[in-house]
Amino acid sequence: SSTVAEHIYSTASAHGKRVQAFGAAKNQAIVMPDADLDATVNAIMGGAFGSAGERCMALPVVVAVGEDTANILIAALTPLVKALRVGPGMHKGNDENEMGPV
């Protein structure tokens, strides 16, 4: 929660500690510049779009450390996201759609 994040931030920063407190989102990924790109992209796709993003551990926020990291992630994720097939999932034999609308 935001209240917990504010408490952690104020307590740690009062002691000169470097802090990142991101309490408003349910889950987030922090991607460092030296991250394995293939593993990171696969984890983001599964976490963000698996179960149509509706499970309790879904990944709604990705924080890329550094502008280069962000640009690389965007370039790698964009074609994969655009290729997702969204449509009705209740029809028998519907193997074309990867996820239904939520």
Predicted regions and their residues:
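ALDH superfamily catalytic-core signature
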Residues: 2-102
